Amino acid sequence: MDLRMSVEDREEFLAGLHVGILGVDDPRDGGGPLLVPLWYSYRPGGPVTIATGRQSLKARLIRGAGRFSLCAQDESAPYRYVSVEGPVVGVEDPLPRAEQEALARRYLDAETAAAYLAANQEQLVDDILIRMRPERWRTADFSAFAEEFES
């Protein structure tokens, strides 16, 4: 049984509302990759966009590696995930206000987004926007697999 998603399905899934898990090589002390949850945005055919502090560990490691991975998943059955990996294709410093607002509104209702932006105004001036072009896609949709057990 092929669990891979079609191109259209994987792009639609990645564009949906999920907290992403960012992965980037962390060569310090011979450790494994840095994996952290974060907000992201994606439009089919475009880059994955993340925001992070200019001097954050994430930003420093991404600058060093020149690429990163991002995984989004459904945490309830039927389980699905999309994982993308690719090179950084753009950095905007500072993070444009319109992008800050769009990202907050993606994850929060309008009132909560406005409160979040106001409360974090000082921190957000230190944020940058990083864009990654997905080159490698890994996907799985366990819907059909789950249907076999239901019938």
Language-model regions, residue ranges each:
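A generic secondary-structure signal marking the coil-to-beta-strand transition
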Residues: R10, H18, G46, R80, ...
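Charged, gly/pro-rich active-site loop segments
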Residues: M1-M5, V82-S151
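Short, basic/aromatic recognition patches
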Residues: D2-I21
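Short, surface-exposed beta-strand-loop junctions and turns on beta-sheet-rich folds
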Residues: S56-K58, A77, A146-E147
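Short secondary-structure boundary/capping segments
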Residues: E11-E12, Y40, R60, N120-E122
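A generic structural signal for nonpolar/aromatic side chains embedded in well-ordered alpha-helices
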Residues: L14, L61-I62, L103, M132
